[in-house]
């Protein structure tokens, strides 16, 4: 069997110019270096296929890196050609703590412990956050470097380098955090992504970066390209979840309804505004009225305010207005206000077909159908999503593609779009799928078709 080759990938993340907060300004250009070297043997790990400890080393008193092979336990690296000595992290303790906290948050959704004390035993990935590239014989534009296997499998015990002394300018700590996460990502098998919100990017801006649950094209500065191992796109969140396991998921978006005000009297076709704050990326925003989703709008990275005009046929009465926002991890944030349109209902006679009047509100009965239960329309399902594979119609819900256990026992997450998955009974997914259906929008109608991939 031929040995896998290791590709050494250099991060050239640019840092905006500004008031200097570091000893030297960051480079304004970057170079890319690919170096093929033999891989080190890998052991089997308890967390999926990869290591579960990421050691951040500030190199107090300096670090010595020995050439040859990749083994964090013995400070060996395939990157330098001779023994290299890296100077220690050049900034304050507060700065170090900020970088550690940022990297920890970035890797929080995965089964890896970010530590600052070298493990006494076992395999681990190390990120040396110290020194400058010239101390390893590298080009001055290099902000970080790490080995990556040519087949994108994770390495057991390798060193990634984030040259802290080469980071400066406005926002240098956030950029240094991104470089650390980026270089460790290469050790875990991630390629570069052409998406400025993901740590695996070379693109600048977009604030703090997170490993995103999106199918992103790969690439550096010159536009998208095919990924080394995954075809036209890469999903960094799915990759790390498979390599490291699932960690602690963050909170969902923060949602505020500035209008209408809670307790307000509203007219026909009243406007609803929702303000959404989300550090990751927003997948969608839903507008619910008295327990039913009347409108779903795709999330926009450059937008934080969403609006909806209530339909003219919305019955008079007390109305609970909800704005729900979901990020790329399907984590939800919600805000609720209660308003009154006209007079509160006193019977179902003034409500829409199938609705009941309760406590002055016109609303459809709360559905009882769980995922996998038979359904005829969205209103039969607690998820408000009735799907069909062409043979049967069942209640379903959104799920995270590629994440094991996203749907629970007995169910699989099937593709219903580039980044969209739905839960379907595993016993019905054997062989080639025939298609499935999505929830209809509005007053509880039947589903509209979507194609489920294998």
Model-derived regions: residue spans:
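Long, low-complexity serine/threonine/glycine- and acidic-rich segments characteristic of extracellular
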Residues: 251-343
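Primarily auto-inhibitory N-terminal propeptides
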Residues: 21-85, 90
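Secreted, cysteine-rich disulfide-bonded mini-domains of extracellular proteins
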Residues: 342-435
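Extracellular Ser/Thr-rich, low-complexity/disordered mucin-like segments
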Residues: 433-446
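Metzincin-family zinc-dependent endopeptidase catalytic domain
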Residues: 36-39, 44-53, 59, 91-193, ...
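A cross-kingdom C-terminal cell-surface attachment/processing module
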Residues: 446-454
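Bacterial N-terminal signal peptides
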Residues: 7-17
